[in-house]
Amino acid sequence: MPKLVTWMNNQRVGELTKLANGAHTFKYAPEWLASRYARPLSLSLPLQRGNITSDAVFNFFDNLLPDSPIVRDRIVKRYHAKSRQPFDLLSEIGRDSVGAVTLIPEDETVTHPIMAWEKLTEARLEEVLTAYKADIPLGMIREENDFRISVAGAQEKTALLRIGNDWCIPKGITPTTHIIKLPIGEIRQPNATLDLSQSVDNEYYCLLLAKELGLNVPDAEIIKAGNVRALAVERFDRRWNAERTVLLRLPQEDMCQTFGLPSSVKYESDGGPGIARIMAFLMGSSEALKDRYDFMKFQVFQWLIGATDGHAKNFSVFIQAGGSYRLTPFYDIISAFPVLGGTGIHISDLKLAMGLNASKGKKTAIDKIYPRHFLATAKVLRFPEVQMHEILSDFARMIPAALDNVKTSLPTDFPENVVTAVESNVLRLHGRLSREYGSK
């Protein structure tokens, strides 16, 4: 039976096996179980001897891959993979995945921990960033057969290595340092066309605003190559060693992986985890008080900026030695406000991915949410009322200045319509806070 050897930073963790019937099983290596660095590959796959055969195995590895069937088909075509199944796709592109996971076919020799890369010219960078237009997945152009990465999510993206001021393609199993996100473009729905051609600017703005308001988010920059405009987001699951000679991968997983769920239920409305389940899980965090506070603070931020995609795959935890865990920075933040009107959608259509508690059921419609719904949710969760008041009060006080500070920091060619759309709607919702908490 074919096997993929699973590594974490030069340590052999175990083996993923695909059975004759297509089922996926995983077994931890004895040396990993005995290691002082030992930790579970996923919190849904506890350290144990023997084969793990639960659905969590398939779901964990499947969640390392792009969500889009179209992108998966491109991977099959590009590398002649046997199928869309996680084992077959990761056999081809599992060298650099989300978190610390590296997957290598058992018959391949691996040399650790050599760092190797190829510097990209601007023309080559543009070729990588536009590869998806030629049905090439994740920027893995044909001339770079050694460049094999897996980046989860629904958006067109790739990952690159930054060395000094140069963008580089990593060689072998050298890690990447940045996720590179391309414009989403138009999304056609039955009753609307969502123009997300400025998604790069949108996300950059939202990340700046989040940071200005004290939220833990990754650094990002807008990069250009030829006619391409992309967002380079620094990976928080990577860290240089003290000598800056080796780039380490940091173990992490998203909430679908944590709970052993498939990506098809990442939304609460589809049966996925909501605020209550995640807040209960964060009670076990090594930084429980901080993580629960930050998570609730981020829920308010998502409401204020009209972020409708805060599903389970957009929240993650670092997995530490022994299996302890803590919340990662927040990521994949984009506002729906710029797509309102015209051929887009109406404000009444915007809904949070995770509902808040109301007098009757759950409240998700952004334009129908008020501070009282966060307080009601906090009460149900036994999150201290005084802390929820503090979060709401801080946003009431900080929003106006934060918006001004972000605006003055934007590049001169930044699209004004993105700023206007987000800012005007944030201020409108902020009014609901300032009426109760003041804005001084």
Curated annotation (Swiss-Prot):
Pfam families listed in its UniProt record: Couple_hipA (PF13657), HipA_C (PF07804)
Presence of the UniProt keyword DNA-binding in the record: yes
Sorted UniProt keywords: Antibiotic resistance, ATP-binding, DNA-binding, Kinase, Nucleotide-binding, Phosphoprotein, Repressor, Serine/threonine-protein kinase, Toxin-antitoxin system, Transferase
Reactions performed catalytically: L-seryl-[protein] + ATP = O-phospho-L-seryl-[protein] + ADP + H(+); L-threonyl-[protein] + ATP = O-phospho-L-threonyl-[protein] + ADP + H(+)
GO molecular function: ATP binding; DNA-binding transcription repressor activity; magnesium ion binding; protein serine kinase activity; protein serine/threonine kinase activity; sequence-specific DNA binding; transcription cis-regulatory region binding
Keyword Lyase: no
Protein name: Serine/threonine-protein kinase toxin HipA
Gene: hipA
